[in-house]
Each structure stands twice: as C-alpha cells, then as structure tokens.
Amino acid sequence: MAAPGEALTSSSYITHHLTNLAVGDGGFWTVHIDSLFFSVLTGLAFILVFHSVAKKATSGVPSKLQCFVEMLVEFVDNSVKETFHGRNPLIAPLGLTIFCWIMLMNIMDLIPIDFIPYAAEHALGIPYLKIVPTADVNITMAMALGVFALMLYYSVKVKGLGGFAKELALHPFNHPIMIPFNLLLEVVSLIAKPISLGMRLFGNMFAGEVVFILIAALMPWWAQWLGSVPWAIFHILIITIQAFVFMMLTIVYLAQAHEDNH
C-alpha cells in the first residue's frame, strides 16, 4: 500500500483505500474501472439469481430462495401500488431492479476493508481497488440521471410537450405575469431531484466506508472487532434504508411524471 521503503501510516492507509482504480488523467473523462466492474458484477448476480429462481419456480413446496424472492417481489409490488396510481407495467420491475441492485452494491461495504484489495494487490498487482460502487459519486449520479431521463420522457409522453411546458410555466402561480418566476422555481426543483437522489445515496455509503477505514487504520488489529462489528450491524440498517429510499423516490418521481398536476 505504501511505496517501497516507505512506512505505512494511518494517513497513507486511508488515502490508499479512498483511491479508485482509474483510467485517465483525473479529469472529467476519468473512468473508475473498479466501480464499473463491481456494479456490473452485482447487476449480473441479481439477474442470474432471479433468472434461476424464475426458471425453477414451482407451485408446490417452494425452496427457501424462492420464498425469499417472492417476498421481495411482493414487497416491492405493494410499495409501487401504494405510491404509483398510473398504468405502466414497467414501474414495478424497475423498482425491483433498483432496490435489489443498490442493495447488492451496498452489501459490498460489509466485506472486510482489506480482504479483496489486499488479494488484488498481491495476486494481480492492482494497486488500488474500491469495491463499493455506491460509495462512488459517479455511479450514484449516473443512476440518478437515468431516473431523471425517465422523468422527462414520461412527462412528455403522458402530458405532451405542450402540457409539460404549461405545467412548468403555470405552476404554482397560474398567471401569465408569473411565468418567469414559475419557470425558475420549477426548473430548479426539477434539477434538484436527481442531484439529491444521487448525492443522498453517495453521502451515506461514502460515510459508512470511511468509518470502516478509520476503524481499521486507527485501532490495533486485535481491537478492531470492538468497533467494526457494532458498526457493521448498524450499517446493515443503513444500506437497506438507502436502497429503499432510492427506490421509493424513483417511484414517486415517476408517479408525478404520470400525473396531470403535482
């Protein structure tokens, strides 16, 4: 982790674990290879597990995995029905995908902080490796921008371009003289949705990762479990809530896009 001949300090340890495996010069076009790899890996894991369960599903005595998946699907479906009152068969599958994918990416934060990076460095020569995709603002903002694109698409599709423009121009004050103020207010509100959606997930997961790193960096190895185990138990609640909040806000935003008034 430290350069050859250089003593490993707490500062260098923390810096090392907060550095991505990247391609580029650190500018806008820099690609974080590790975040992309683990986000795709968790996405494939979700697809393979659900495909396997769907393929082996039986009306008889279900397996434990089938019971778990059915409970998860029912939970998401009920959440969608309570929030989304339009007619769009894609919303529930989208909500399920978002919840499960983010949950799997968040769970990566429960893996011991040095386990995979140490193996990658010594076996493959990879100097830096961050395994929690949702602790990378590029991943969370990319997902939020995807939701934002769906919001705009369904707003125009359901209301028409003119109807959507009218909604922006005449809300909340239905008077021509207030159009400039309405536009400013609505555009700022619209842009704030994906920013808050992505930054909320990133902030919570990045903070959780930093706490694990600080525990590993500042406490002796024999005492690390005193801090890491209680925090990991509490962090399970955080990673679940953050996946649920992202899913629910996505459903709420898409429900607003399907309504004539909001």
Swiss-Prot record:
Gene name of the encoded protein: atpB1
Annotated InterPro entries: ATP_syn_F0_a_bact/chloroplast (IPR045082), ATP_synth_F0_asu (IPR000568), ATP_synth_F0_asu_AS (IPR023011), F0_ATP_A_sf (IPR035908)
Organism whose genome encodes this protein: Photobacterium profundum (strain SS9)
The protein, known as: ATP synthase subunit a 1
One family name in Pfam for this protein: ATP-synt_A
Job of this protein: Key component of the proton channel; it plays a direct role in the translocation of protons across the membrane.
Molecular function via GO: proton-transporting ATP synthase activity, rotational mechanism
Membrane-crossing segments per the record: 30-50, 91-111, 131-151, 201-221, 232-252
Principal location listed in the UniProt entry: membrane
